[in-house]
UniProtKB/Swiss-Prot annotation:
InterPro entries in the cross-refs: BAH_dom (IPR001025), BAH_sf (IPR043151), C5-Methyltransferase (IPR050390), C5_DNA_meth_AS (IPR018117), C5_MeTfrase (IPR001525), C5_meth_CS (IPR031303), Chromo-like_dom_sf (IPR016197), Chromo/chromo_shadow_dom (IPR000953)
Superkingdom assignment: Eukaryota
Bias-annotated ranges (Polar residues): 266-279
GO CC annotations on file: nucleus
Compartments, record wording: Nucleus
MF GO annotations: chromatin binding; DNA (cytosine-5-)-methyltransferase activity; DNA binding
Name of the protein in its database record: DNA (cytosine-5)-methyltransferase CMT2
Region annotated Disordered, chain positions: 1-34, 142-189, 265-302, 442-468
């Protein structure tokens, strides 16, 4: 059995002598009184015979050195969740007003200690025992209560004092210390012994410190001021058998020993401070005892003032804990008036509770925690848009709920249940506050930022009002506040009042609140503005101002609160919380509403903004106050609508480029206790930026111009409200109704009347999958979106794009050089392009563009610049000299003699440069800022791809392959398009905590673009592959933010999205009936194609079958010549040509291996001869057989195949089957790593079959070698996915989409050409 730790403030007890009762039969470790120390101990404390029983342990404990000098055990966690304080029992304290109980709960034994019966009531003691226990002062015994051997004391000269009139020593920290010295005392060793023994008895069992903020299981409330309804008082009494009285060696009862009685007399007369926490009280007792020792012979005046006793209020489940020999808890009324009338000193005392451990006294005893109310950790914050369990109480303060990452997961219906990755328990049941799921970056200190946003301080700064109030309201409110300072104050029905400054509070003037023009009812402050004290905080009181809103008005204004009360609810007996039978979340039982509240020195009205307590060491939260209400359990709450800082959003640590004063409005609301409010803060709304630059912000603490939604990480513009209208509406709980999306139909002309054509720039275009899909979808929605410019550094991919989009200006250069070229082109246009130039001058230049000069007039020895035909930035001559170059057509020479010349060498050709710039500007050979409507592209992802084994995890931007995201955003910032579409692999959300994705989103928002992030699966839009891609949508602040299109097909999804971005997966909500077609499988796309062999080399061939499925009918119906509005011309597809239907030719060895793969579902390399599979699902060679060799002498089964994924992979040399889908289309077909063998033919899937897997029409042709074509297809965006996004873009541009992040596509969208009838 573990022994209790030694007292942290008492002198060490003397060790037992050999052979003594405490010596453990004379054990060597027990020790004894040293011969040289006997005289010293006798002089200080008395004879060992008298003192030894006091140090004896209680019955049942082991005896010896282990007990005599026990070491403090390290802190351990008890069942309540807090650290063990080193005592056998721990005090849970009392929380007033929360399920209080009048009965005294028996103490609970801590781990490692035996349970004892609770102390018998006082009235149950025999007369002798009662007299002993009810002496002049409360008796305090040491933990080690042994046999009393002291002689009987002489009879008392004074009559016994009645118990009710008996005084107790206050143990507190707030009362002033004794200033007058104690009267001198006679110097004697016995008196000195009394003082030292007093130190032992009083401080050997000090009260524990305040509950640690991390001891959430205690559920205790910190000591409160005089206004608290009840405070625990403690008396100590002997809990042993009252029939047995301990005696000394000479037969005298220990209780009546002379020294002990003197000690009790001195203890009764020692004044201690009041209203202090236990840890400070313990230290004060030490100091007082030392003072008494320093004044020899001093006598302390005894206090015998009356006190009033009351019953202790205990919260349900809280037990009074402590050693039964020393603890008996009673409750003393805290009524100030009653104590004054009785003539007694108003004291709050907690004494003789179990000793605290050294670690607690050392670490936490010196600090005083703020006096604030705490709640049990099992409580649940309720009535929130996103309800979740409360995180542990921070620093003893009330828990603050802010919905962010603690939002319940959403199951997306992308496929049948068995095909989906389970996403249950994303949050793990744990709660991460807003600066959590996402780690918040350290907030920067800005002079304009109020101190309340920074680290919490005990004195929050005083800030301005949250809103600019009307003059009429301000005047009335000022008069009301003035009256409040001198008016009368009525008592709260719950808690006794404390007079403040002996002032009174009078009635406040009537303050009308102007209602909205809708059906909202008027609420007026026509009641007496009286303060009702609710709680105590570190700065003062929290109280409601004014009487409650009348019930009928409150029900009209906040019907959702009172409808809950009228419905049938279940009651949880453990937490006294009420829940719906089918709601699945806790709700608050509201009693009444208020319109104003005061916290500390701030008066808050509904609609004002405030700081709300955040985690310890973290910035406070910011929110708007929507409701003030009291529950039927007597708790006061407020409802808050949150604002997000950039660090609080998904941007996280990538928010360095954002203004620290910029906030983001949100619809997330939560209910919190009233004392969570810290101080006021001023927040203003500013209009959205049109040119991407921040406008001047009015003088305020913060401002906001956008709204943030966790779903799909959406940043959207909100409508700028009139100040007066906003003020009128801010007093209602429906303030969110005023924060509507921008109604662009009212503020802008319809684009149908302005411009039905949009221009697109495709960066990193490849073969054109993304721009092709966007243009097809937009045209289907009624908007003519055309790709005017395309950029890629892959020359072969540029040829494929140019071949299929002849109207597009395709440039083969890097995006970095293209950005520099745009900047130089802008300078040239500003220099040479003048609007005053006549059209005739331009036309004359245009007419001579295609003419060939007369070579006979040019001397053969001279070269003359005839004209400039192109422009680029870079190093076209490969001479390691980057710069601006012009392509020169020499006079007398043809195009094949054109050369690239640097601009420095054309200083004498300003005329030619001017003509080229003017003509290029007219033909828009390069875009200028404002010329581009849509920028799309997918920055290269080799630096983050899972196939790259040399990724930079710690610093992603150190990799040159990852810097293209920066360049992409730089192009957007320069051109300022209306819409932005960026695509990337799913690994961008998995790699390095999604740093690159957060950066891209941060750049868009910093440029005042609306933004939205989503994850789309290709199989959900009519393809037999489960490739998932990330799409970042950006939109100008004055445009409609396009939604994500909902899936059209069930999909067989094999890869799940990252849990941190699970809410970004585009899918059907759980409460919406799905309208999905059956999944598309390989048979739907392959069954009509002619058979080809492994060595097929034809680039063109005819179809041998007609379309067998709806997918085949659609994919073969595109016109060969045009991809415009008439691209869906249907014709006899049997006579049409089929392009690129040839596979990658395998060498003879690999072809021999494919021949031995069976033509059945699931066949792979494990079916080859000589391979066995063990019970561990690992494929290995059969040791009993000789290894099979091919005719070339190489083994049939390669060692690299057996080592791939430790022999557990099923993909090497695998056959796909008719009813299956493929994972993704790779850039390099490799049968050794992927299942790419045709179901019925001994070959790999052809180029055309791979193109169909990506949704390319059959008339889309590719250039380059076979490997080049596979690579282009593998790098492309699936065309059906881009098509769905393009249709949603058209609906947003035409103002036909709603504000929701998702939209429903028309019926049979995947295989229909003409969709304008459904738009």
């Amino acid at each position: 059995m573990e022994t209790p730790p030694p007292d942290p403030v008492s002198p060490p007890p003397p060790a037992a002598d050999e052979g003594s009762p405490g010596g453990d039969d004379g054990a060597e470790d027990a020790g004894g009184f040293s011969a040289g120390l006997d005289s010293l101990w006798t002089a200080l404390f008395g004879s060992p015979e008298e003192l030894e029983p006091m140090w004896s342990p209680p019955r049942g404990f082991g005896v010896g050195a282990e007990f005599a000098a026990a070491e403090v055990e390290p802190e351990i966690m008890d069942v309540a969740g807090g650290p063990w304080d080193g005592a056998p029992w721990r005090s849970s304290g009392v929380v007033a007003g929360e399920g209080a109980a009048t009965a005294l709960v028996p103490p609970t034994a801590a781990a490692g200690f035996a349970e004892f019966e609770p102390a018998a009531p006082i009235d149950s003691y025999p007369a002798g025992a009662a007299a002993a226990s009810l002496g002049d002062v409360p008796e305090v015994s040491a933990l080690d209560s042994g046999v009393d051997c002291s002689p009987d004391p002489p009879p008392s000269s004074s009559p016994p004092v009645d118990f009710d009139a008996r005084g107790f020593d206050p143990v507190a920290d707030s009362a002033p210390a004794m200033e007058s010295p104690l009267p001198p005392s006679v110097a004697s060793s016995e008196a000195n012994l009394d003082g030292r023994m007093l130190d032992c008895t009083l401080n050997s069992v000090p009260s524990p410190p305040l509950a640690s903020p991390y001891e959430v299981g205690l559920g205790a409330e910190d000591p409160i001021k005089d206004s608290s309804p009840s405070v625990a008082w403690g008396t100590t009494m002997d809990a042993k058998d009252p029939e047995v009285d301990a005696t000394c060696a000479n037969g005298t009862a220990l209780r009546r020993s002379r020294r002990i009685m003197k000690i009790k007399s001195a203890a009764s007369s020692m004044p201690l401070n009041q209203n202090g926490d236990s840890s400070r009280a313990s230290k004060r007792r030490v100091a007082d005892s030392r003072k008494s020792r320093s004044s020899e012979g001093s006598k302390l005046p005894a206090f015998t003032g009356p006190i009033s006793v009351n019953t202790v209020d205990l919260i349900n489940g809280v037990k009074v804990q402590g050693l039964q020999e020393i603890v008996a808890v009673e409750n003393v009324s805290s009524s100030y008036d009653n104590n004054q009338k009785a003539g007694g000193l108003y004291n709050q005392v907690v004494v003789a509770l179990p000793a605290a451990s050294n670690s607690l006294l050392k670490d936490k005893g010196a600090s005083v925690l703020p006096r604030r109310k705490t709640r049990l950790a099992s409580k649940v914050l309720v009535n929130s848009d996103r309800v979740s369990a409360i995180s542990p109480v921070v620093n003893g303060g009330p828990p603050v709920q802010k919905s962010d990452v603690c939002i319940p997961t959403k199951k997306h219906k992308l496929a049948v249940e068995e095909c989906l990755t389970s996403l249950d328990g994303v949050d793990g049941g744990g709660i991460v506050l807003c600066n959590s799921k996402l780690k918040s970056a350290k907030s920067r200190v800005v002079s304009k930022t109020p101190q309340g946003r920074g680290r919490r301080s005990p004195q929050p700064p005083k800030t301005q009002r949250a809103r600019t109030l009307s003059v009429k309201y301000l005047e009335k409110l000022k008069r009301a506040e003035n009256n409040n300072n001198n008016g009368s104050m009525s008592k709260s029905p719950r808690v006794p009042m404390i007079p403040e400054n002996n002032g009174s509070m009078s009635k406040s003037p009537r303050v009308p609140i102007i209602p909205e023009l809708s059906t909202k009812h008027e609420l007026v402050l026509d009641k007496h503005m009286v303060d009702s004290v609710m709680l105590e905080t570190d700065d003062g009181s929290c109280f409601f101002v004014g009487d409650a809103v009348p019930d009928d008005e409150a029900r009209k204004q906040w019907p959702h609160r009172y409808e809950i009360n009228d419905q049938i609810m279940k009651k949880d007996k453990r937490t006294s919380s009420q829940t719906f039978a089918n709601a699945g979340k806790a709700v608050l039982d509201v009693k009444c509403h208020y319109l104003q509240a005061k916290v500390s020195r701030y008066t808050f009205c509904i609609g004002e903004c405030a700081f709300v307590k955040g985690p310890e060491g973290k910035p406070n939260y910011i929110g708007r106050l929507l409701e003030f209400f009291e529950t039927k359990t007597g708790e006061c709450y407020f409802r808050v609508q949150w604002f997000f800082t950039a660090e609080d959003t998904v941007i996280g640590e990538q928010a360095q480029s954002h203004d620290p004063r910029r906030l983001f409005y949100s619809d997330l609301t939560d209910d919190n206790l009233l004392d969570c409010i810290v101080s006021k803060v001023t927040i203003v709304q500013v209009p959205p930026s049109v040119d991407g630059k921040s406008k001047s912000v009015p003088s305020s603490d913060y401002y906001y111009d956008m709204k943030y939604s966790i779903d799909y990480s959406t940043f959207s513009t909100i409508e700028m409200e009139d100040t007066d209208d906003l003020m009128q509406s801010c007093y209602t709980s429906r303030i969110n109704d005023k924060m509507k999306k921008i109604d662009v139909n009212k503020k802008h002309k319809s684009p149908v009347l302005e411009k039905m054509e949009l221009s697109l720039l495709d960066l990193y275009c490849g073969c054109g999958g993304m721009s092709t899909g966007l243009c097809l979808g937009a045209r289907g929605g009624g908007v003519n979106l055309s790709a005017r410019w395309a950029i890629d550094d892959d020359e072969i991919a540029c040829e494929s794009f140019r071949n299929n989009h002849p109207e597009t200006r395709v440039r083969n250069e890097t995006t970095d050089d293209f950005l520099e070229l745009l900047k130089e082109w802008e300078k040239l246009c500003k220099t040479y392009v003048k609007h005053s130039r006549t059209k005739a001058c331009v036309d004359s230049t245009t007419e001579s563009n295609n003419e060939t000069p007369d070579c006979s007039t040019v001397p053969p020895e001279e070269f003359e610049v005839w004209k400039l035909v192109d422009i680029c930035f870079g190093d076209p001559n490969k001479v390691s000299k980057h710069g601006l170059y012009f392509k020169v057509r020499w006079k007398g020479y043809g195009p094949h003699h054109d050369t690239w010349e640097p601009v420095e060498g054309l200083r004498n050709c300003k005329e030619a440069i001017r003509d080229f710039v003017i003509e290029g500007h007219r033909q828009r050979i390069l875009p200028r800022p404002g010329d581009v409507d849509v920028v799309c592209g997918g920055p290269p992802c080799q630096g983050i791809s899972g196939y790259n084994r040399n990724r930079e995890f710690e610093a992603p931007f150190k990799c040159e392959k990852n810097k293209q995201i920066i360049v992409f955003m730089d192009v957007v910032q320069f051109l300022k398009p209306k819409y932005v579409y960026m695509e990337n692999v799913l690994d961008i959300l998995k790699f390095a905590d999604a740093t690159l994705a957060r950066y891209a989103l941060s750049r868009l928002v910093a440029m005042h673009y609306q933004a939205r992030l989503g994850i789309m699966a290709a199989g959900c839009y009519g393809l037999p592959q489960f490739r998932m891609r990330v799409f970042l949508l950006g939109c100008h602040s004055k445009e409609k933010l396009p939604p994500f299109p909902l899936p059209t097909h069930e999909a067989i999804v094999k890869n799940g999205c990252p849990l941190a971005f699970e809410r970004n997966l585009v899918g059907w909500p759980n409460d919406t009936p799905m309208q999905l077609a059956r999944p598309i499988v390989l048979e739907d796309i392959l069954s009509d194609l002619p058979e080809v062999a492994n060595g097929e080399s034809r680039d063109e061939m005819l179809y041998v079958k007609g379309p067998q499925t709806e997918f085949q009918r659609y994919i073969r119906s595109f016109n060969v010549e045009v991809h415009g509005p008439r691209a869906h011309v249907t014709k006899d597809s049997k006579s049409s040509k089929l392009y690129d239907h040839r596979p990658l030719v395998l060498d003879n060895d690999n072809y021999q291996r494919i021949l031995q793969i069976p033509k059945r579902k699931g066949a792979n390399f494990r079916d080859l001869s000589g391979v066995i599979v063990g019970p561990d699902n690992v494929a290995r060679l059969d040791p009993t057989k000789e290894r099979v060799l091919l005719p070339s002498g190489r083994p049939l089964v390669l060692d690299c195949i057996l080592a791939y994924e430790n022999g557990k992979s099923l993909r090497p040399f695998g056959r796909v089957w008719w009813d299956e889908v493929v994972g993704t289309v790779l850039t390099v077909p490799n049968a050794r790593m992927q299942a790419l063998i045709h179901p019925a033919q001994d070959r790999l899937l052809t180029i055309r079959e791979s193109a169909r897997l990506q949704g390319f029409p059959d008339n889309y042709r590719f250039r380059g070698t076979v490997k080049d074509r596979y690579r282009q297809i593998g790098n492309a965006v699936a065309v059906p996915v881009g098509r769905a996004l393009g249709y949603a873009l058209a609906m947003a541009y035409l103002k036909k989409s709603g504000d929701d992040p998702l939209m429903l596509l028309p019926p049979n969208f995947a295989f229909s050409h003409d969709l304008r009838g459904f738009a």
